[in-house]
Amino acid sequence: MDSYTHNSIPEHGHGHVLQQVEKVLHMTSGVEENSYSHNSALQKTVISKVRPVLEGTVRALYSKENFPRYFSVADLGCSSGPNTLIVTYEMIDAIVGLCRETGHSPPELTVFLNDLPSNDFNTDFKLLPDFYAMLKKEKGNDVGPCFIAGMPGSFYGRLFPSKSLDFVHSSYSVHWLSKVPQGINNNKGNIYMGKTSPHNVFEAYLEQFQSDFSLLLRSRADEIKLGGQMILTFIGRSIKDPTSRDCCLVLELLAKCLLDMAAEGLIQEADIDTFNLPHYSPFIEEVKTIVEKEGSFVIDRLETFEVNLDGNDNEENKNYVFDKFKCGQNVSRCYRAISESLLADHFGEAIIDDLFERFAERIGEHLSMEKTKNFNILISMERK
């Protein structure tokens, strides 16, 4: 752990994260213990939940397009590590299976892996040789040429040529906003929407999501062919109230850890007051309203599902036994992997180990009393 003392409060908290989300935000790089690559079991569980919808949609789309020779897809917010290529494999598997059943030749497939420029694309690219070898071994001549490329940039804006994509997918990315909402300097003691947040904070977060999500839809409408499909999965909330427990509880616990550190003189409370996460968990009706208002897509499916907060507590892990300490560590490392870049940029790297040790203890205690789940929204849309 980096050292710091009670008498030497780090001089960070410049608030520049407000304007530099695109430059700062990334999942923790590499393959070490605290990396996203090692702490993304929750995200893998979400991908597995969506797999039947993904495969059914890809099969129906490829058939509807009359088995085209070329098929182009994009995965938005791909991040880094082993999860990155799971969706690509599932799409290939669906197409290969359909071609086998119908006697058609497999297409040439182009896959664009998109994330912000600060993403660890190098880790992703290092996975490609083994991935291509696995495809050849498992599918043989049943799989056509597959070209996988990185496409750095924000999906809140254009990324690809007009009408160049057949299918777009995104998992656990759209809840990240393009920037922290403006005008929420009065959100004292919170790092997100919370029970004590003033009303204008809720309004600002919703307005930023409306703006960002509308821009995402407009951008993809230009890039997806008519009749093409898009599937998005992201964190949401179960009720309209923006302070619902499935929306705010975990981040309120993280904020309490920061406030404890401020009370001990380890960080400045003013720095907490100027830090807010660029994140929004929408209510399902908010999503539906934005899609209908933007007007470029028809909603095929709009549904919700839940997964346990500890990604290791899933249907595939039959031997899972709850352990307060281990569960707290699992959840803490997951949240560290997704938020460390923003927290370290604002508060300094020296506090990160201590912060997430405290968070592991708090979240473990909470989960020993109450099983908490992540509430998710799945939307499948067709380009008009």
Predicted feature residues:
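Soluble or luminal CAZymes and related metallo-dependent hydrolases
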Residues: 46, 208-212, 279-283
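Mobile active-site "lid"/loop adjacent to the S-adenosyl-L-methionine
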Residues: 170-215, 224, 238-275
